[in-house]
Amino acid sequence: MKNNKIYLLGACLLCAVTTFAQNVSLQPPPQQLIVQNKTIDLPAVYQLNGGEEANPHAVKVLKELLSGKQSSKKGMLISIGEKGDKSVRKYSRQIPDHKEGYYLSVNEKEIVLAGNDERGTYYALQTFAQLLKDGKLPEVEIKDYPSVRYRGVVEGFYGTPWSHQARLSQLKFYGKNKMNTYIYGPKDDPYHSAPNWRLPYPDKEAAQLQELVAVANENEVDFVWAIHPGQDIKWNKEDRDLLLAKFEKMYQLGVRSFAVFFDDISGEGTNPQKQAELLNYIDEKFAQVKPDINQLVMCPTEYNKSWSNPNGNYLTTLGDKLNPSIQIMWTGDRVISDITRDGISWINERIKRPAYIWWNFPVSDYVRDHLLLGPVYGNDTTIAKEMSGFVTNPMEHAESSKIAIYSVASYAWNPAKYDTWQTWKDAIRTILPSAAEELECFAMHNSDLGPNGHGYRREESMDIQPAAERFLKAFKEGKNYDKADFETLQYTFERMKESADILLMNTENKPLIVEITPWVHQFKLTAEMGEEVLKMVEGRNESYFLRKYNHVKALQQQMFYIDQTSNQNPYQPGVKTATRVIKPLIDRTFATVVKFFNQKFNAHLDATTDYMPHKMISNVEQIKNLPLQVKANRVLISPANEVVKWAAGNSVEIELDAIYPGENIQINFGKDAPCTWGRLEISTDGKEWKTVDLKQKESRLSAGLQKAPVKFVRFTNVSDEEQQVYLRQFVLTIEKK
């Protein structure tokens, strides 16, 4: 009997070891992976072969991972180096002949970490770090390399730039996940854009940039410093020399990769011939002269297909005139869009080179009241050879953005093996391992953007959507709903509450919790409201129903308070959560159950939820999908970040739900030039219109309404020409009844 127990114990241990060896999961997934059903222990004593010649950043990582003692004569042999080094010369044929490729082998005799170049060796170490678990390594042979040349992040969003500490954390995260590019281009950095792009950084900011460059180098990331001069650049020698001087100052700070952005501008800065001449001058007089410049990238003015003039030659001019080594960025068919084969073929044909993709996800600078924590999907997985780079534009919430960044790292390294859901789950487990299930629950219901000017949406709450739809349909029709669907919703709300509490108390990743806290509070209130609404549906008796009704109204008030006091940015202020499936389900169920109660008891309970009573109508393409917002007695159109092309005769109109005394209208088109092209009108019936005079101070337009009755407000381009403006502000203030 004793021998049988020993045999069973040994069999279990062998099974565990075999399972560990077989279930090797790596992110990003390698191009070629062979796993043996064996493991080895991390050596207690080892000989390091090639440590003095190999990439020092890789050697540093290796020594941090090894807990054993280094010896010159005994112990397991660990060979590390780059192709051509003596230490790994016999493995030259095994090393993939690709930039940043590597060969990794683990067996009982030797560990080999061999890169095609220094960065390849560093990436071999990142894979080695993932293989090492609890002091054990599976026997493997890996041949790996990236499918896309440049992979990373562009900090190119509008709003609050990342903090210095957040950027340092990001750069380390990129290195671990085999991303080689960080493009520094925050829209609100005054020394990146007009008018201060000509000026040097103050000492404090310069020192921080210098530290970022150093940390980027340690983690094998190209720090790409971008300049955004197009809004006020003069096409003359003086400005050209000032730009080159700024690049030289950044070079002295350690920067070795550069970008010039011409996005979201209007005026003479949009001239493609002049842009090409400037970039070529930078390339020939700066980038090619320096022996160590890595990347030179430009973002064009027409950076997506929908903004490209079909009758113009902007993109073809860049394709013909720009030096071949200069990369050209592209966001896809629209500002916010996924990358398709047809789309990338269209742009590559015009720019005569593979596009450098600027993917605008999970950026939320046009839906700042939402968190975008869902999976990365929608991009073609067969077009790696058609693009030179793939960088993601993140949220202003740096830590929260890592969920998508992790997934983009996996996609860009090996699109053919990219697994949307597995990568998303791995990302969450990497970012918050101690509460991965709770973060997954929160992220599952915080992935959609809500209605927005770009019309870009994401799936959300997919696991309960069928049950929610079936239940709501049956309940609204007065039919018996499926008990299993009802219980699914009950469990979902219970799990949401639990997850919220656990996340709020988590201390493992404090920066993440600080970022998401307002949304987590709102998430919990949403779940509590859902539970109470379901209890109203069960409707035991009149007094019980009224108790739950009063509680729901109190929860609505708490949610309104959070929405009005947290995340009060000037564009899309507030906190929205679970907006695609769960919140509409709760609101519609509440409205229906209150209607049934009122009919049964001849009552007049208010069934109002947070709906939008007013409407906005426009035939201006970039405005027509922008959501309306209500803040106290103000009705405002959500601002747009990009240049709005307002055709002659087109208009924007706000229709209120009733006639109100009007107080004033505030408009800002981001232009100091006199707004002689526009006409502002008000109406009570949408038929008879009264023109309202506008006063202008710099770019701000205002009109006092002196409590004139108003239900409709309309602004029209009455000129004969298209106007290019920025919709910074459009606010109607009324006197509430």
Curated annotation (Swiss-Prot):
Function: Can hydrolyze the glycosidic link of O-GlcNAcylated proteins. Can use p-nitrophenyl-beta-GlcNAc and 4-methylumbelliferone-GlcNAc as substrates (in vitro).
Residue positions of the active site: D264 (proton donor)
Leader sequence residues: 1-21
Miscellaneous information on this protein: Metal-binding observed in X-ray crystal structures is artifactual.
Enzyme superclass (EC): hydrolase
pH dependence: Optimum pH is 6.0.
GO BP: any one term: protein deglycosylation
Name of protein: O-GlcNAcase BT_4395
PANTHER family per UniProt: O-GLCNACASE, PROTEIN O-GLCNACASE
